[in-house]
Amino acid sequence: MGIIFFSLFEKLLQATGRSLYSTIGQVAGAVVNIILDPIMIYGIGPVPEMGVQGAAYATVIGQVVSAVLLFIFHIKLNKEFEHGAKYMKPDAGIIKEIYAIGLPAIIAQALMSIMVYVMNLILKFSPSAQTAYGLFYKVQQFVLFLAFGLRDAITPIIAFAYGMGSKKRIKDGIKYGLMYTSVLMIFGILITEIFPSSFATLFNAGSSREYFIGAMRIISISFIFAGINVAYQGIYQALDGGMESLIISLLRQLVIILPLAGIFSIFVRKGRAGVSLIWWAFPITELAACLIGFVFLKKIQKIKVERLTH
């Protein structure tokens, strides 16, 4: 239950531009979890040894701590919100608007799991390639979390500007959001391209080391396009473009990447190419989605931004 309220109050604080307090709540829960893990797993002091069950308890307690802290921040700081039982009455119009924007994000999360599962099936012919992909996926998520963070920052800013009817602020939010995201992604590319061996050692790639390094050198090229796609999705959501956000998610994680990787794997299994051919499916997919995303952005700007008067 803690994660439900944690997520709710975290987003309410982010929506009012109080991301610092959102971060404090997250960190507090994580610290409590880290402290309680060894205590409850191995049994320290009056706490009995609980093993894996103890780790689960520590996680739940950490989530509850975060939820309570974020709730306090929300009540004390988010004066923009009015609270009361009368606001608990379901409103079909509001629910529809919430799902119009939120459903694409829900589907995107589900697609991520589906993509990883199917990619592992595609790579089934090579256990080393499977392992390399699994390890690199962790590195990729670490880099893309930078883009996710900026997306969460620019979405409320652009949404505020859109609600105010400020064309200049919307354009500034889009410009700087894309620019800063690109800078961070270029940094991510440089780090992964220059130090692939260090990452292989860090993640204990073992016999999959060469596959891991090969995957990193090729797939990391896609970071710049992937980061921009993530930013695009935040911009679309801020401008009430949930469908465009959903389409980009489908292109990136299902429609292009999986058929392309599947086709490339046929050539690899027949000995006509190396496993590296499959890794090229990632940059190609992100570039294609990025180009389509740019078209969507121009369309949304023309329809929803250019008509604004100030």
Predicted segments, located by residue:
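Hydrophobic faces of transmembrane alpha-helices in multi-pass small-molecule transporters and flippases
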Residues: 20-27, 69-72, 87-118, 123, ...
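Helix-terminus/linker motif at the lipid-water interface of multi-pass membrane proteins
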Residues: 41-50, 113-137, 142, 160-161, ...
